[in-house]
Regions:
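Membrane-core helix-loop-helix motifs of multi-pass transport proteins
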Residues: 65, 71-202
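Membrane-embedded alpha-helical segments and adjacent helix-loop junctions characteristic
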Residues: 1-68, 74
Length: 202
């Protein structure tokens, strides 16, 4: 509901047009637009609000930029990968792991081996951040390759590979702060910080 409300508010207030002009002024290259709008902006939206919002907000922005509707939806759904575990300000980890596990039973077992719940919880979310961050290094390149192969004018994998250095750079700009935030700050901020740093650098 929130995503649809935000989208309609942006549409009727003229916000989508302003955002479209802003992104179109950055570059006319759709591959780069996909990396900035779908990947980095989508990761930020996922980190801030979660619950499928990137697909509901980023996809219409991509359509407004001139992407085919199906390509916009596919790219919007592919964002639902790396940032999701820390989406909605860490809700999946905080609620899913923090509330989903039997803390009493686990705490007894942890005390038996000289540990506690906080240490285990930190271990879980830091490992999730590292695992997803490393895999996330390849997601932007995969997104661009799928876009150029199935929705590009020439339907070519090579056109996607042509921007591989920029795609990997974009991924690293997101993944390094994402992993650092996941290890040192907690489960609330990795997706938000990774996306904001990535948007600032790229």
């Amino acid at each position: 509901f929130g995503a649809i409300l935000l989208l309609n508010t942006l549409k009727h207030s003229g916000g989508i047009s302003a955002i479209r002009r802003g992104f179109a002024n950055i570059t006319p290259d759709r591959r780069v637009q996909a990396l900035i709008v779908a990947w980095l902006f989508g990761c930020f939206i996922e980190g801030a609000s979660g619950f499928g919002t990137p697909a509901a907000v980023a996809a219409p922005l991509l359509v407004a930029l001139g992407f085919p509707a199906l390509a916009a939806v596919v790219l919007g759904m592919m964002v639902q990968s790396t940032p999701v575990s820390f989406g909605a300000v860490g809700t999946p980890i905080l609620v899913g792991v923090g509330s989903g596990l039997d803390k009493t039973g686990i705490s007894e077992q942890l005390l038996a081996v000289g540990s506690n719940w906080e240490v285990l919880f930190h271990l879980i979310y830091s490992r999730v951040a590292i695992t997803h961050g490393l895999i996330g290094i390849f997601m932007p390149l995969i997104m661009v390759m799928i876009m150029t192969r199935f929705f590009g004018k020439n339907q070519s994998w090579k056109e996607g590979l042509a921007v591989a250095p920029f795609a990997i750079f974009t991924a690293i700009c997101f993944s390094v702060p994402y992993m650092a935030a996941g290890v040192f700050l907690g489960p609330e901020f990795p997706s938000i910080i990774g996306a904001l740093v990535g948007l600032a650098i790229v």
